[in-house]
Amino acid sequence: MLNATKQRRTPLQKTLDEFSVKLSIGIISICIIVLFMDVFIAKEQLLDALMIAVALAVAAIPEALGSIVTIVLSISTQKMAKENAIIKNLNAVESLGCVSVICSDKTGTLTQNKMTAVDIYTNRMLIQANHLNHHEYCHNILLKAFVLCNNATISKAQSIGDPTEIALLELYQDYNYKNAYRLQTKRQQELPFDSTRKLMSVTSKNHLYTKGAPDVLLKRCNRILIDGYKEIFTNKDKQRIMEQNDALARQGKRVLGFAYKEFYRNTLEKRDENDLVFVGLVSLIDPPRIESAQAVKDCILAGIKPIMITGDHVVTACSIAKKIGIFKQGDKCLEGTQLDKLTDQQLRNYLPHVSVYARVAPEHKIRIVQAWQARGAIVAMTGDGVNDAPALKQSDIGVAMGITGSEVSKDAASMILTDDNFATIVKAIITGRNVYTNIKNSIIYLLSGNLSAIICVLVTSFAILPTPFLPVHLLFINLITDSLPAIAIGMEKGSDEILKQKPRGSGDSLLNKETILQVSFEGIIICIFTMLAYFIGLRSDELTASSMAFGTLCLARLLHGFNCRSNLPLYKIPVNYYSVGAFVIGVSLLTWILISPNFHSLFSISELSLKQLAIIFVSAAFPSIIIQIYKMVSSRYN
């Protein structure tokens, strides 16, 4: 099943592929137009026109984008690793920001994975677990079953095994039974627990001991142990036991049933798990993690649907889900047997109303994931067992448990939780959303700056004026004023407000209407003031015009890096020292080029007067002033 499960491409991969195609078509079209205008209208030499067109293409293409995406994702993985989330695939970081459904295991992820035996029902009486009396026959048989139907080991140094089995061994030890290990070694045969039978059986000293789900176990019993005697198991007894089971389950407790019988054969088969003598029930509690309720609230606030998937009894599952806020009034709970009866279409129709899946097997998980994906959801699925691997691989974000998870599940997952904690997933989602926002803001910065250069070249081509930028200018702009501020924007920490946003769709484009309008608005404003400096310089000569246009565009784009950090005005967001550093480096290099005579010939820069340098500074500052005023007004009304 694992080999047959195909891993889907991440939303970031889809978005960037679509963005690249659209951008390439646009740039090629513009370069062809510029080449045509220069050759046939401006009467430029073909080689010169070709150099301008190629340089324009180089300037228009955001070469820094690939490195920005990689750097941002890499830094985010380091941050998430410190927060107990190890990312195996870089693209999975951003995919977390798209997650709209989280399918989580209950035990250990939403709960503390610290089982404690609480109640015992035997001899038709409910008693506290610490009131067992090993001198009573029923209690003695029950305590033996606790140890024999058990593969855990406990010592002063550590406990190894399933938390439920560890809790049963600890209860056994509370009664000064120091021979638990010796008793376990006297087991002769075992039928291990599996999710289909929901039973485990062992043989020891001519007896068969069985533990399992009470509703399943009762169907295998025809007698009941009362005061040391085996009596007929009546329907009234079964009803009383199931009522007690449901009452304990409603309190969020896990309930196990125990039975035994005499057994003299040398081979143990599944058909031997019949005609049993019912001994009693034990309830165990695994409290919800303290942080689970808040994490669930954060999920709902973020527009994410949290879902609990467990093998526990439906009543137990719903009780825990209610305590932490997953199961609300009007929600439904679906059992594995009910799931089997639904067609794929029926399941898809049920999905929005179901918040708890109980008594499910690992193969049910993959159906749930596929059904949600068919509805267009981005699904995160947790798992720890070998059989969970196909569902982890099928999901958009497979989340394996670092403590209790199998190596197979870790291999199939995109992310590993080193603390097995649901709240860690929510933290990772916040980071993922911030990553996408930073990448998008970096792209807006690159495109708006590139657009301003393209429009300047187009305007001068149509007006049959000298080109405002030489190829060396465009290359400097692309390497310095593009890369450093864009990388700094990608390092933005983000705000807590990002949690209040709804998850974006997997098909949402980077170049949507809103982004195109923003890029166009900002690019045109930068272009207007660049051309203003160009025309002022043109009064002197072409080289001065080109120098002033180059200086204005470089400085305007360096300042624009601060605008693209957020949709909020600068005074509402904390300082990003990476952006400050990028600006200082960029301005230092630009000043060196504009002032130092040694670089004038290399970059084709003329000697500029103080007045011309002041015009460059003012022209470069105005676009950012206008954009900041717009952000102030829009943030006040929004």
Question: Language-model features: where?
Answer:
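Membrane-embedded alpha-helical transmembrane segments of multi-pass integral membrane proteins
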Residues: I30, F529, A556-L559, L589
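Short, hydrophobic transmembrane alpha-helix segments
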Residues: R539-S540
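Membrane-water interface at loop-to-transmembrane-helix junctions
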Residues: G505-I524, L543-T544
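Generic alpha-helical transmembrane segments
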Residues: T481, I526-C527, S546-G561
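Conserved cytosolic headpiece of P-type ATPases
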Residues: M1-K500, L510-L511, I524, F535, ...
